Amino acid sequence: VRNREHHDTVASLGAHRVVLPEDFVDAGPYDGGLELVGAPSWPGNIQALATWGRIMVIGVGAGPKTELSLVDLMQKRGTIRASTLRSRPLEEKADAAQAMVRHVLPLVDAGALTVPVEATFPMAEAEAAFDRFAEGGKLGKIVLVAA
């Protein structure tokens, strides 16, 4: 978590360990990880991967192309998987939505899973909401409320 001010809050949400990005590799090894930054993270991801570790690529916001040492991955006996909803057929998207309804929403309803909300805005203030979304330092969702 980039912002030290958010570490306690992230820990209270259930994180086993909270580290700064620059400490990520040294704080490993990790059994698994979700990758959503992309190319700049790859050298550290492989270095911090535990033996038999897994990486699931779900985003490439900072770039999709990288160089990867297959020998390093082989020595870790690691696994890389990748997925995106965008290119899936409508039926698969519907299945994913139904799985959320079955498995995740009951946890939200029971209070076992919470989603941090940074700020709420009425729909009429959508531009201000987008501006807040574009700012750094958030911990949580920016929510537009329809009246």
Where do the language-model regions lie?
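Short catalytic-loop micro-motif centered on adjacent basic/acidic residues
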Residues: 31-34, 54-57, 115-118
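Generic structural signal for individual residues within well-ordered alpha-helical segments
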Residues: 8, 43, 127-130
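Glycine-rich phosphate-binding loop and adjacent beta-alpha segment
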Residues: 10, 40-112, 145-147
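A short acidic, often aromatic-flanked loop/helix-cap motif at beta-alpha or helix-coil junctions
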Residues: 23-26, 88-90, 122-123
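Structural signal for short hydrophobic segments within the conserved structured cores
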Residues: 16-19, 115-121
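Adenosine-nucleotide cofactor-binding segment
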Residues: 1-41
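C-terminal capping/lid region of NAD(P)-dependent oxidoreductase domains
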Residues: 105, 110-119, 127-147
